[in-house]
Amino acid sequence: MIALLGKMRKQMNGAVADAMRYYGKDYGLNYGVSLPTVRSIARSEEQDHEFALYLYSQQVRELKLAAMHIAKPELFNVEQASTWEQGLINSEIAEECAFAFLRHSYELKEIFHLWVEGENMFATYAALMAMARSQVLTKYEVETISAIVNCYPDSRPIAQGVVALLDAAYQHDELQSDVRSILASLSTSPTADYILDEMSWRIPETE
């Protein structure tokens, strides 16, 4: 860990750290290393799941993000879901979890339903974004959307995650009617209004 942290610290940039914008809590330590650089350094390391879990437990932004690339997605299962969920404190770490790690898990569907039914908004966000980029999206995931929006009526991350999932679902002919039904069922709220506005230009009115 010390060697990896040393590589990160060489790329420290206070201006970048000060300019960062994300939803949620701040990290304990933030060296301001850009995401592309964090990814590049992490990918140069050999995959080691136990080491990744150790990195993830540290209160350092760059180590938490690097853990997503050093961990082995095939070992990300329901039993470990709570461990990873606890570290999802903001939109940045949730997005990295979704794109680099969770979407490749063999148990994505099980983790998706576990996280969207939980109380961590950023875990729900990660689940939505990961499922949107997966090959296992079905009507059962689409059918969770109304409950998610009702649970988070004023959340921009959730709204963005829902749009990503519904947009992905609409690319499948067999799911288009399900997407339309969900959109028609949404009650007025900041989250729902954002979703409806974004989806309005993604779904042609003539269809």
Language-model regions: role of each:
Residues M1-E207:
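Alpha-helical scaffold domains
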